[in-house]
Amino acid sequence: LVLLFQFQSGWELLKGLKNITIDGGGSTLLMDGEMTSFIIDSCRNITLKNFHLDFVAPTQTEIEIIEQGKNHLLAKVHPTSHYKIENEKLIWQGNGWSFSEGIAQTYDRKEDVTWRSWCPLDGLKSTVELQPGLLWMNYQEKPDTPPGMVFQMRDAIRDEVCGLIQYSRDIRLENIRIYYAGNFGIVSQYSENLAFEQLYFEPEPGSGRTNTGFADFLQVSGCKGKVQIQNCRFTGAHDDPINVHSTNLQVVE
């Protein structure tokens, strides 16, 4: 079963509830646009389990370099990376979002290694679509990227999270496969006793994608009690897989 959601904010809002279990039964929840997939707010004893999360057009776009020339790159676009070309300018886009400059990492499939990198949108003079999904990219100077490398590109703005848990206690997420997390991962704040079991942040096997999210996958901020993270797998982050910290704010007049 695949469910498609095409609106902003959260598809699943749990607020002020207790003793609830939502079992997805292996369903895939497919997001279209920049969305927060779920919110657990002021709840107690909530379990979410047994479903997959993915996006129609992930906000991190991917190209694989086929050829490097004196002043050009020949690039193959991943099918889930949507774009348009206006006056020879390359613009990445999805439902309600777009960018034409940003941040990038490169990924080496053979070595399974990722580096911070220059962005192939930088210094780009013009782009020509040779055929759908195949781009000829002209540069002011010789681009320093060999064939076979994959660019993972994104905007610098983190304006949506995959999931939000706040002001809640005794929350459990179990057996959830997150093929793409969006502009941030699952953020837990001001909550108590959290359990994350068998969460798999990784591109869907066979999809050809190499990244899973903008930033931290699990961020726990200002929480208390016991936080359990067991039997999880994290692949393709542009920041920390797990980040646990306090939240300290200075009050000024």
Predicted regions located by residue number:
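Acidic/polar low-complexity surface segments
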Residues: 3-14, 56-159, 198-220, 239-253
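Extracellular beta-strand-rich solenoid/capping regions of secreted or surface-exposed proteins
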Residues: 3-21, 30-49, 54-73, 157-168, ...
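Short, solvent-exposed linear motifs at loop/edge-of-secondary-structure regions
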Residues: 13-26, 226, 231-250
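All-beta strand scaffolds that present successive hydrophobic residues in beta-strands
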Residues: 21-24, 45-50, 170-175, 193-199, ...
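Residues in short coils/turns that link rungs of repeat/solenoid architectures in beta-rich domains
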Residues: 29-31, 55, 180, 203, ...
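A general structural signal for short secondary-structure junctions and capping/turn motifs
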Residues: 39, 127, 187, 232-234
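Beta-strand/loop edge motif enriched in small/polar residues
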Residues: 155-165, 173-181, 196, 213-238
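Conserved, compact domain cores that house catalytic/ligand-binding motifs in diverse enzymes
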Residues: 161, 165-207, 243
